[in-house]
Amino acid sequence: MNKLNITYHPEYDIPVPPKHRFVGTKFSDLFSYLQSQTYFLKFQVTQPQRASKERLLRAHSLSYVDKIYEESLSDNDLKKINLPWSTQLRNRSFLAIEGTYQAAKLALNYGIACHVGGGTHHAHHEYGFGFCIFNDLAYTALNLIEEG
């Protein structure tokens, strides 16, 4: 029997204030729950690498991607994202967007795969929005198309 591919990285969690709407540990909480289940033995866990700038530019503008690399978002940028900026958020964003892509590639090869840290699809080409730095669905689709 083939194992179900699960994409996850331990750096997905981010620090947020205690009463913030976004639960900064939700990804590790879910992964820990999955690990506690007997069916976890049927999972094959893979970890994504950080997304490259070249691949990010297929879904986002150079000026916006540079702001993330340089950690130079304006107060207005951060207001749209609605998350406190941290290096952990930056690193998580580069990992999670590639995690969605990796899960999609695995699903194409094996019929199904899951990404524990996906769903960052509210970001726009020029700015982040709604808890999302990058748009993982646009990134994944555009990179899959580009790579055939």
Model-derived segments and their meaning:
Residues 1-148:
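HDAC/HDAC-like amidohydrolase catalytic core signature
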